[in-house]
């Protein structure tokens, strides 16, 4: 007789609710977990135990029915199920190497994924998880690999967690002689792919590539793989979290410690006249390719507009040529007054409006609902984005 299948979700980043297990058919029915007051309940991640190696187990996913109690506010009605339903689920038998399932089968509001592994347990998730522990291990590994990198903390979160950050520079140039580069991911906790993009950026930056060495020698780079550390750790979605999410919090009085700390450091670069490139990494809507969000040009002045467009041209020229393909649009989407009432408090917009005349500040949205939206695909995007930063800055006047 087959062992009973069980579901565990008592570990970092896990999230699941409404679990029902049919031991006869080996079908696990579930919904994403998460407190809707702490963001969109579309992220799911849990461990299945009691599997007979080689048997077929099915995951039957329904969208969350959770709502918030704020009249007219976010999630006054349930979130569309498509946000929780990638075409392919992600799984791992060791919690380190993540693979896609075959395409799920959608029937109305239910998506069914099939899992078959040669193991007695398996982790399953919306996408490849990237937890606070992953971020900490990565920045520590990069610091140990290279004496040009220093693993540090951006701050401590409101719940007391460390927010890992990597600081990178090489050589004897003074700070005043260096370009300033700020890269951050995961202001929305459910967008796990953005952290893998960030990791790819960091891996390239500290590689033996001559262009990477040039960037280290000519710039000071700050790198934060997870901004919304608390919601990432607790398996909450983060997007539209109350009182506002991290990417609606770049105001004169931010709520979140991570935003307070990032804003302070970015403001320092601005005051020094060297906030050259600011990149905020996200994942988009289910049907979107990779693309940049920009602040509408009417809110900007030259040379910022021309420099922004040049950077996008260089990044598109690299990312769109990645093999296997990562679909990317060369037409950015715009934000501004018509997009969201808090548009001024989006991080990339805040940096654009408060930055130096030459600042390039962008949000990159990397496709997640695609066959090549894997840890390898995401990291390739990050590496090519970093190479585009180097190419762009090499065109800029050398800082005296």
Model-derived features: positions:
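A short, polar/proline- and glycine-enriched secondary-structure boundary/capping micro-motif
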Residues: 68-75, 134-137, 175-177
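Extended acidic/polar, glycine-enriched regions
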Residues: 103-159
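Short active-site-adjacent structural elements
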Residues: 286-289, 370-374
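Extreme N-terminal flexible tails
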Residues: 1-118, 122
